[in-house]
Amino acid sequence: YEHTAENAVVKEMLLVKFLVDSPVARTDALQIVEHFSGKTVDLTPTSMIAMFNGDSPKIDAALGMLAHFDIIETVRTGKVVMARGEQPT
């Protein structure tokens, strides 16, 4: 059975750790996180971990916008699915 956005809730989560080694880089990163309704879950003077939730195109776009930063590591869940309505998945 194929689950689609019409008959199921389909989401992914992405954690991305990257360097923010200047005030300008930090500001740019925070604007990208905010634009994609992400959340900063860890912040040090030189690095940041951002979390994004959403459908695959949104996650791909957020990661693409962060590509110009020095990315240390990423963790991505893949699709998590639950059928809409009363029917079990």
Language-model segments: which ranges?
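Long, contiguous binding/interaction regions
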Residues: 1-89
